[in-house]
């Protein structure tokens, strides 16, 4: 629906073309001996090649549950590459499979996959962000493209943009307005910590088009040394 709205109102006019990734996620239940509640792990690259963007996440939830996932940029050039198979290869890494495999000698049971799924994600960042308001409505969260691809994070952005849009809608209703544009919403975004965060990461995908080594180096320089001032 969001893509239809963007096309109908030409909200992406003058913006960089959006780029996408595919995220694959599994929910596991693992042995308590290998569960560390609150542990969060991220990785970039392996098993992907130098010129293919991607990374992973592994989160330890409560009740011995673990969420593990892998994201691959859909601009990869190898026609034989399978994001699903790359995800399965990723889980064979010694530091990752340790959480899922059992050890009969130590009485550790192997993990059990409970559920799985996949979805496309927007990865273009701030430079691909469309106009987020139109007559009578607004775009928030991943539908607009607020994902911070450099950190594989989007939930916090979805919550924040939802709050800002709701506040703008409330003010409009209190003023007796209807079916116009909630201009207060994009204004609030531009003055928020979220805009600052996404602005620092705005060139992330552009750098990684030059390969993982250059992308990692320049992203580090831009985000941590120059604080996005480039």
Per-region residue spans from a language model:
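Residues forming the flavin
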Residues: 1-229
């Amino acid at each position: 629906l969001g893509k239809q709205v963007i096309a109908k109102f030409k909200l992406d006019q003058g913006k960089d073309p959006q780029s996408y990734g595919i995220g694959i996620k599994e929910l596991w239940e693992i042995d308590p001996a290998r569960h560390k509640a609150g542990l969060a792990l991220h990785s970039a690259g392996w098993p992907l090649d130098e010129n293919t963007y991607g990374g992973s996440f592994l989160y330890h939830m409560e009740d011995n549950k673990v969420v593990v996932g892998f994201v691959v940029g859909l601009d990869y050039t190898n026609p034989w590459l399978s994001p699903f198979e790359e995800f399965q290869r990723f889980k064979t890494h010694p530091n990752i499979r340790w959480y899922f495999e059992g050890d009969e000698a130590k009485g550790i049971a192997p993990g059990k996959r409970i559920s799985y799924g996949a979805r496309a994600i927007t990865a273009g960042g701030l430079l691909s962000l469309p106009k987020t308001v139109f007559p009578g409505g607004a775009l928030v969260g991943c539908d607009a493209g607020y994902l911070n691809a450099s950190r594989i994070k989007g939930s916090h952005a979805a919550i924040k943009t939802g709050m800002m849009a709701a506040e703008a809608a409330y003010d409009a209703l209190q003023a007796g307005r209807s079916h116009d544009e909630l201009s207060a919403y994009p204004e609030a975004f531009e003055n928020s910590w979220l805009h600052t965060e996404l602005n620092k990461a705005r060139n992330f995908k552009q750098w990684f088009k030059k390969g993982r080594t250059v992308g990692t180096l320049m992203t580090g320089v831009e985000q941590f040394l120059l604080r996005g001032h480039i």
